[in-house]
Swiss-Prot record:
Lipidation (N-myristoyl glycine): G432
Modified residues (Phosphoserine): S5, S339, S513
Taxonomic lineage of the native organism: Eukaryota, Metazoa, Chordata, Craniata, Vertebrata
Tissue expression remark: Detected in eye lens fiber cells (at protein level). Expressed in retinal lens epithelial cells (at protein level).
Example of a GO MF term: structural constituent of eye lens
Pfam families: Filament
Residues flagged as site, Cleavage: L34, A35
Name listed for the protein in its UniProt record: Filensin
Chain positions covered by the region annotation Linker 1: 69-77
SMART domains: Filament
Residue segments, region Linker 12: 178-194
Bias kind Gly residues: ranges: 408-417
Marked site: Interaction with MIP: E457
Stretch list, region Coil 2: 195-318
């Protein structure tokens, strides 16, 4: 964002050559002596004016030094920043203590976690031992059941053998009884053959009977043994059944005990798992807090670095404003004393608001460094606008002051062109919200300064006239007439015209005459023919060849400056001040700005003074105020105002009617 303000001060030359009675009455030999005397008087006046300017500069520098000392004594943003830094350091210490406490808690939690882990491992080992014992008991119970089943099968087999033996013995006993009965019947029915035969047969029968009895006794013994074996097996069976029931009861009781113990162990395991999870979550929270604390500590360090950089930037900016402020920026435009009280306080408050804002970390737009430069430039503009106007006391002095962003270079032709450079580095700047508030306050201060010094509009007298037309054409209109100037940038503004009437003094003290704005020049070649005709008519007794030699050079500088300003560079304002050989000509040109740039149309002006035989003079001031609405990248709505004051000196001759009425050249805005 560019901001330019052109303030022109001009001194009206004397009108000795334009008076017909003066040169006609003098003889031809005295003309060179009179010219030399006039040149000597002009040189003396210039030296006196320079001495007064140096005195004014010294006084202004002294006042500025006092103002800066008072501003340094007042509690500024450094104290607030120091308190903020102290608070941040205290907070960092608290965070460090909290970090140490969290580390201790983390160590305790880790120790508790290790204890819980060891307990959990011991419980797992006990559970494994109990599982092994239970498996072993289950195996023993299975083996006992298998042995019992085997014994039951053997008892069943023995019972079957016993029953089979009983049946066989019963059959044998029946057969023996049947055989005995048959033998008894035979003995009873058969005749006794002889005693010997009977004795033999009875002997045989007795033998068979004995043999049968022996067999029966043996069989009975075997039967008794089988019964005893059965009873023994039954006793073993009962014993085995009792052992089986006892084992079953023991197994059942062991299962119940183990189930209860397993349930208790499972509950303890669940509780330990929950505690471990809680400890892990607390550990994660602690680690997250530690990371947050580290990030906060780094952020605080970055903020401290940014605050230090902002303090250094503001200190260098104040020192650069104090050191690099030119004479024309400190000295009032018309010799009035400079007042820095209210503007310095308001600007200091606005700068304090800007520096107190929280800076961003990244992604700075390109327009912000330029806006930082505008703050320091607005300080200088407000000091110039606060200074009241005062008529000068010495003629033939031309000062052109240009406040822009560029380097300071002397103008062509021995003039003084001052262009302070205040550029801010691409450092971090405050955030958008607080910047908008601070710039709002700054805009209010500038608007109050601009609106507070507008002069009233007096009624124009009837016997005065002006030769030029002052028209500002905005919008989509375009005219070919060189008297009009069209702007393609939508602007809002106004034109204030005021006419002041005063009488010329014969002692050489005249009212200041403003500069005449030059028409737009294409490609830096030449000027319109109508303008050249006016120059030739109103510049009597001047060296035209010298002026023509300087005009193309100035126009080329103007075209080059216009091109360079479109690229973002800044050039000083070339100024031409008449020397001793050219007392009646002073020419000033300023570089034009690109219409497609961010600042809208800039003012082009030049001053050309001519002589006339007038006794009564008046000054017509045309103030053109342009307010261009711009939307920046951060959605901050700003208004840029460019004020151009063009003063036209209009004279009307009352003493001599032969040469007619003459006026100064046209002015164009």
């Amino acid at each position: 964002m560019y901001r330019r303000s052109y303030v022109f001060q001009a001194r009206q030359e004397r009108y000795e050559r334009a008076q017909p009675a003066g040169p006609a009455a003098q003889p031809g030999g005295t003309a060179p002596g009179l010219a030399a005397l006039q040149a000597l008087g002009e040189r003396v006046a210039v030296q006196v004016q320079r001495a007064r300017a140096l005195q004014q500069r010294h006084a202004g520098l002294r006042r500025q030094l006092d103002a800066f000392q008072r501003l340094g004594e007042q509690p500024g943003p450094e104290d607030a920043l120091a308190r903020h830094v102290e608070a941040n350091l205290q907070r960092a210490r608290d965070l460090t203590a909290e970090h140490a406490r969290l580390e201790r808690q983390e160590a305790e939690a880790q120790r508790a976690l290790d204890e819980f882990r060891s307990k959990y491992e011991n419980e797992c080992e006990c559970q494994l031992v109990l599982k092994e014992m239970l498996e072993r008991l289950n195996k023993e119970a299975d083996e006992a059941l298998l042995r019992n089943l085997h014994l039951q099968l053997e008892a069943q087999f023995l019972q079957a053998d016993i029953s089979v033996a009983k049946d066989r013995y019963k059959k044998n006993l029946l057969e023996i009884q049947t055989y005995i009965t048959v033998l008894q019947q035979i003995v009873q029915t058969a005749p006794q053959v002889s005693l010997v035969t009977g004795m033999r047969e009875s002997g045989l029968l007795m033998q068979e009977k004995l043999f049968t009895e022996r067999e029966v006794a043996a069989l009975q013994n075997q039967l008794e043994e089988g019964r005893e074996a059965v009873t023994h097996l039954q006793a073993q069976k009962a014993e085995l059944q009792a052992q089986t029931t006892a084992l079953e009861q023991a197994i059942k009781h062991a299962h119940e005990c183990y189930d209860e113990e397993l349930q208790l162990y499972n509950e303890q395991i669940e509780n330990l798992r929950k505690e471990i999870e809680e400890a892990e979550r607390s550990l994660e929270r602690s680690s997250y807090d530690c990371r947050q604390l580290a990030v906060a500590q780094q952020t605080l360090r970055n903020e401290l670095d940014r605050y230090h950089r902002i303090i250094e930037i503001e200190g260098s900016r104040l020192s650069s404003v104090f050191i690099e402020t030119p004479i024309s920026l400190i000295t009032p435009s018309h010799g009035a004393p400079l007042s820095l009280g209210s503007s310095v306080k308001d600007l200091a408050r606005a700068v304090q608001d800007i520096t107190a804002a929280k800076p961003r970390q990244k992604a700075l737009p390109k327009s912000l460094p330029k806006r930082k430069e505008i703050i320091a430039q607005d300080k200088v503009e407000e000091t110039l606008e606060d200074a009241p106007l005062k008529p000068p006391q010495e003629p033939k002095a031309l000062q052109v002051e240009r406040k822009a962003e560029g380097g300071s270079q002397p103008g062509a032709g021995g003039g003084h062109g001052v262009s302070p450079t205040q550029e801010g580095g691409p450092e971090d700047v405050p955030d958008g919200g607080q910047i908008s508030k601070a710039f709002g306050k700054l805009c209010k201060v500038v608007k109050e300064r601009v609106s507070g010094h507008k002069e009233p509009e007096p009624e124009p007298p009837t016997d005065l006239f002006t030769k030029g037309r002052h028209v500002l054409v905005t919008g989509e209109s375009s005219f070919v007439d060189p008297e009009f100037y069209s702007s393609s940038i939508p602007a809002r503004g106004g034109v204030v015209i005021s006419i002041e009437e005063d009488s010329m003094h014969h002692d050489g003290h005249v009212e200041p005459s403003p500069g005449q704005p030059m028409p737009p020049v294409e490609n830096g070649q030449g000027v319109p023919q109508g303008r050249e005709g006016d120059h030739s008519n109103h510049q009597q007794g001047t060296d035209k060849n010298g002026l023509r030699a300087k005009e193309p050079k100035d126009l080329e500088e103007k075209d080059d400056d216009g091109k360079k300003e479109a690229e973002g560079s800044r050039r000083p304002c070339p100024v031409i001040i008449p020397g001793p050989d050219e007392p009646s000509t002073s020419h000033s040109q300023t570089s034009g700005s690109n219409q497609g740039g961010p600042v809208g149309p800039a003012s082009k002006s030049s001053s050309l003074l001519a002589k006339g035989p007038s006794k009564a003079l008046s000054i017509k001031k045309v103030e053109v105020v342009e307010s261009i609405e711009k939307i920046s990248t951060e959605s901050i709505q700003t208004y840029e105002e460019t004020s151009v004051i063009v003063e036209t000196l209009i004279g009307k001759s009352k003493g001599n009617k032969k040469l007619g009425e003459k006026s100064l050249p046209d002015t164009r805005a």
